[in-house]
């Protein structure tokens, strides 16, 4: 990210938080703020900002106000490493981020070596916490749990059909596809096709022709919404009438913008929608009053800040290592996702994944609704 852009965004953050002092706690927000996955970055940014505003109004972390600085990783591991090094150089000690597993895993090593605690709102690859670094936490669920749900669902509902498992060759996408494949196989069904495509590809006509020739009746996609939307639309255009199923990488209304009416009936796994929790009604209204729909990772980022602040206050310290210990030992912490405790690895206690289906809501717009 260009220095001028970074400084400009930081200045906006300082103004938004009402100024800063040398005693303020600097929290970095690492996310894809530009590029094809910027919709998720915006969710994270909005969630963090709202949670920090609430925390600061209540006294911050042990009486110290929180100041936000931003790092645009553009969903790219190399850019993410640059962001991490920039955060370290600026004296950031806590990070809400990153989003993509392929960014969070390499940056976590940099943060661990430099005393920075990170809470990832969207990193679902099991490897992120399986290494048991002292500083890695997440407020989202894991792909091994997500794959179990998706694989069993397909084995139960398409056992007489043929399944294609596709992925985008990223740590998140291929990792999720592999976990889903494992579950599908363990539930007595073998996939007909297993193929990877490149993130950023736009023409899937050859792959769709191959799936038509193979008689595919269900397609599982391990990847993000930009490619998913194109796949869904092109499948419809080429007459492939197969059920499309994916994971939490497609939970953005941009999916419907890309896929059009072909998005109707698409299914995906995700955690129960926090927008359905009446306890969040006031917060949801506040977002909507500002013209922002708080989708998906808005709440996971918000919960990350809540967990951080509550753990620091419980520890009576803003030292990252002491806060990390408190996160594992002082829970549960009250959040917009419900009460969360963290295990020794940094994984949260959350309800299981569920299935969602895309259809038109009362407003006439496509959205994902729990089945």
Swiss-Prot record:
Keywords: Amino-acid transport, Signal, Transport. Residues 1-23 form the signal peptide. The keyword Signal applies. Disulfide bonds: none annotated. PANTHER family: AMINO ACID BINDING PROTEIN, LEU/ILE/VAL-BINDING ABC TRANSPORTER SUBUNIT. Component of an amino-acid transport system. This is Leu/Ile/Val-binding protein homolog 2. It comes from Brucella melitensis biotype 1 (strain ATCC 23456 / CCUG 17765 / NCTC 10094 / 16M). The lineage of its organism: Bacteria, Pseudomonadati, Pseudomonadota, Alphaproteobacteria, Hyphomicrobiales.
